[in-house]
Swiss-Prot record:
Pfam families for the chain: Clat_adaptor_s
Subcellular location(s) of the protein: Cytoplasm; Golgi apparatus membrane; Cytoplasmic vesicle, COPI-coated vesicle membrane
Statement: the UniProt record of this protein carries the keyword 4Fe-4S: no
Protein purpose: The coatomer is a cytosolic protein complex that binds to dilysine motifs and reversibly associates with Golgi non-clathrin-coated vesicles, which further mediate biosynthetic protein transport from the ER, via the Golgi up to the trans Golgi network. Coatomer complex is required for budding from Golgi membranes, and is essential for the retrograde Golgi-to-ER transport of dilysine-tagged proteins. The zeta subunit may be involved in regulating the coat assembly and, hence, the rate of biosynthetic protein transport due to its association-dissociation properties with the coatomer complex.
Species the sequence originates in: Oryza sativa subsp. japonica
Protein's gene: COPZ1
Protein name, entry field: Coatomer subunit zeta-1
Keywords: Cytoplasm, Cytoplasmic vesicle, ER-Golgi transport, Golgi apparatus, Membrane, Protein transport, Transport
Amino acid sequence: MESCPSVKNILLLDSEGKRVAVKYYTDDWPTLSAKLAFEKSVFVKTQKATAGAEAEIVMFDGHIVVYKFIQDLHFFVTGGEEENELILASVLQGFTDAVDIILRNNVDKRTALENLDLILLCLDEIVDGGIVLETEGSVIAEKVSAHGIEGATSLAEQTIVQALTTAREHLTKSLLM
């Protein structure tokens, strides 16, 4: 019997292995101490890896963990050992792409903590109860911006404003030099 693609957890840890944003979708880790122990173990196992722009995959404690590092943030998606690695990798890619869009290409711990509500909304848009809903980063980011902060401008408008601000900064710098 085929089942829907599922995820056991999504973790966003800092460069020291501390929580930034985490969501667990199964009872594989029933207590907070079990969750923290799993996070520490995964972090230690992957810490020496050179995960860069591409996702890395590791079997860990009967689970498949797909991970990626961006600056001082470590992104992890965990699935069961029977889960398709490509699906887990696409969930990870969708999450990192959405975070990149929402944080306007400034993906670091400080910015992530300042926008933690939006990152948690991303997790809600990607997975519900362990079932994968969406893996396209731009779609996730647009949904988050649509029901994020009331009265906020749309993501497209934010991008235009950001481009104009950047152009103005470059023009000012060139005029002052």
